[in-house]
Amino acid sequence: MGIFVWRSSLSMTNIRWLHHRCLSLYNSSHGFNEAKIKKKLAQFTGGSVDLSKSDDGIAEICINNPTRMNAFTGTMMIELEERISDLENWQDGKGLIVYGAENTFCSGSDLNAVKAISNPQEGMMMCMLMQNTLTRLQRLPLVSVALIQGKALGGGAELCTACDFRLMTEGSEIRFVHKQMGLVPGWGGAARLIHIVGSRHALKLLSGAPRVQPENALELGLADNILTGTEAGVLSEAKNWIMPYIKGPSDVTRAVKKVIISGREQNLEDALRTEKEIFGTVWGGLANLQALAKGTKHK
């Protein structure tokens, strides 16, 4: 009985922590009016953000607006937030692949929407919405991969930094073009980029806006692999690449991702406590007991 109560207490503590992590960065106390900016963005239609989930625990998000190089319209920004909400509630999920329709990743924001929200107040509202969404994407208890075909420009480059891994195809490129537009990243891309490549390389990528091709991205640590398959088969190749990282029970894979999130976002003492709590949710669990019975530690 004592063990059950202890495990239940750990589970509740973990649930509270996860709920806190899923909370948005911005709310009304920061001057963020989500309903107002969504109403504004809803005027700019076109494209879609499509979500599919499979029985093997892998979800796919497709940025689908190929006539505009998969740029985000206003309704697509809203849809992305809704898709992330869906994934937050998907208890069987282990992995996520984000890609763009028709062999290009994403070219950032659609200019029609950008021009219509050109004043600083509405621009900051859009910024807060997308930072909320991409931070929640990064915090999902899923191993996430951005599959980059063609171009990842501006906001598209920022989107790929919200994933755990980035796979690039031959001939693709990542480019932070914000400076050429008289801007800096606003969807959290700069902060995430520094964590990925370091401040020195991040400064070069943001101030010089170079075209980062696959080989260079590998050297920088911005990409994790270069896929060489055909355009038709590259999504399957990405699935094969992610499989070793999500093999096994979903609760264990999700626990691994959770300790990574806590280690990245919390101070050391809090991260250690969170790790202990998450450890308690899998210790003595079915997967742990089966592994002990099989003696699989060194196999």
UniProtKB/Swiss-Prot annotation:
PROSITE patterns: ENOYL_COA_HYDRATASE
Cellular component GO terms held in the UniProt record: cytosol
Localization, UniProt: Cytoplasm, Cytosol
Its EC number(s): 4.1.1.94
Name of a matching Pfam family: ECH_1
Alphabetized PANTHER family for the sequence: ENOYL-COA HYDRATASE-RELATED, ETHYLMALONYL-COA DECARBOXYLASE
Family: Belongs to the enoyl-CoA hydratase/isomerase family.
The protein's role, per its UniProt record: Decarboxylates ethylmalonyl-CoA, a potentially toxic metabolite, to form butyryl-CoA, suggesting it might be involved in metabolite proofreading. Acts preferentially on (S)-ethylmalonyl-CoA but also has some activity on the (R)-isomer. Also has methylmalonyl-CoA decarboxylase activity at lower level.
UniProt name for this protein: Ethylmalonyl-CoA decarboxylase
The organism's taxonomic lineage, starting at the top: Eukaryota, Metazoa, Chordata, Craniata, Vertebrata
Gene (name only): echdc1
